[in-house]
Amino acid sequence: MDKELDTEAPDWRSVCPIASGLDILGDKWSLILVRDLIQHGTRTYSQFSESPEGISTNILAARLKWLTSFGLIEHVDPDAAARNNAYRLTPSGLALRPVLEELGRWSHTYLKPLHPDIADIV
């Protein structure tokens, strides 16, 4: 298994809080999943897999496990069928909302010249 997807404690790069946060959230998909939960509240595995960014099922499963292991998301009424499991943000996951909002504003301001089709901030 790819070390990045391992749910064991990360290899902390340094004592810097930004680097430590990125050790947990700095992959390509984690903040996209958090974004979806902020926008929609609760999401099922199937709903995540239908995201326009096109996350593969093996990466999705690993990311959900990773974010759950660090207490950022939690299962809601899990059942035997993994595709029907629903997830929601915990208080520590919800605390990322202003971070994502600011990242969205920054992207809209500074990346629009490079990516003219970038969506307006909602």
Question: Which residue ranges define each predicted feature?
Answer:
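Residue-level recognition of specific faces of alpha-helices
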Residues: 21, 36, 47, 63, ...
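N-terminal leader segment of winged-helix/HTH proteins
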Residues: 1-25
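A conserved beta-turn-beta hairpin within the catalytic core of GNAT-like acetyltransferases
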Residues: 11, 43-44, 83
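Basic, amphipathic "hinge/linker" alpha-helix immediately C-terminal to the N-terminal HTH DNA-binding motif
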Residues: 26, 79-103
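A positively charged, amphipathic N-terminal helix/segment that binds anionic biomolecules
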Residues: 2-3, 65, 87
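Amphipathic alpha-helical dimerization/coiled-coil segments
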Residues: 97-122
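Canonical helix-turn-helix DNA-binding module
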Residues: 48-82
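N-terminal helix-turn-helix DNA-binding core of bacterial DNA-binding proteins
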Residues: 16-56
